[in-house]
Regions:
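C-terminal domain-tail junction helix/linker
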Residues: 161-213
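Extended, low-complexity cationic-aromatic segments
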Residues: 1-87, 193, 197-199
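Acidic, metal-coordinating catalytic cores used for nucleic-acid/nucleotide bond scission
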Residues: 77-78, 101-112, 131-136, 161
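Short coil/turn segments at beta-strand junctions that form active-site/ligand-binding loops
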Residues: 14-15, 96-98
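Short beta-strand segments
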Residues: 18-20, 99-103, 127-130, 183-184
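Active-site proximal helix-loop segment of RNase H-like, two-metal nucleases, encompassing DDE(D)
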Residues: 69, 139-161, 172-174
Length: 213
């Protein structure tokens, strides 16, 4: 946790810090009936019944200083797709500038093929957040914006419709990117975790995450 927060509070010079994660199994949902639009005196409504038309997984990297996001959708979220995304980042940031990647310790990120690729590309430096601490990864905040504004109330008749909505949101965001500013120190976070543990013992213990290779 210390090194991740250190990157946020004091980013290294002559290097880039990217918060990386995948939003997996995003569903393309089509409502069975049209919703009623928002109007004066009445909230917009939509049916709770829906049809599923498949899923996609979004890999995204948030550059913390400018707030720009690089994202790509894939059908699955195995180590093969993660490697493709790493190659995309390698092209997106050409040259030899060091790239510090903040991510969780999901098994896909530690696959042998990924480790071998990283050995051949030493400018990629990985920083893993502690288990069950995805809130430390700033790209999760961006995922929240994406979900609220482009996915949650959307109507998607195909996976392609869903991907088009995600890509449109990405394009609009990057025209006027907004960085997420981190202010909490390690000491303040540690104190809050101690307080939570006193209130609800065991609530800060790591939880296992299903692995996908």
């Amino acid at each position: 946790m210390t090194d991740v927060i250190g990157l946020y509070l004091n980013p290294p010079q002559q290097a880039m810090v990217l918060c990386v994660d995948e939003k997996s199994q995003i569903q393309a949902l089509d409502r069975t009936q049209p919703g009623l639009p928002l109007k004066k005196g009445r909230c917009g409504t939509m049916t709770h019944d829906y049809k599923r038309h498949g899923t996609t997984t979004l890999f995204a990297a948030l550059e913390i200083l400018q707030g720009k996001v690089i994202g790509q959708c894939y059908q699955r979220h195995r180590h093969q797709e993660f490697l493709k995304f790493l190659r995309t980042l390698d092209k997106e940031f050409p040259g030899q500038v060091p790239l510090h990647l903040v991510m969780d310790n999901y098994g896909t990120h530690k696959h042998e093929n990924v480790r071998n690729w990283l050995k051949r590309h030493p400018r990629f430096v990985l920083h893993f957040v502690p288990t069950s601490s995805s809130w430390l990864n700033l790209v999760e905040r961006w995922f929240g914006h994406l979900d609220q504004k482009a996915i949650r109330r959307g109507v998607f008749r195909s996976v392609e419709d869903l991907k088009a909505s995600i890509e449109a949101f990405l394009t609009a965001w990057n025209k006027d990117p907004k960085p997420f500013v981190w202010t909490a120190t390690v000491e303040s976070i540690t104190e809050k975790l101690r307080t939570l543990e006193k209130i609800q013992p065991g609530c800060t213990s790591p939880r296992r995450r299903k692995r996908t290779t």
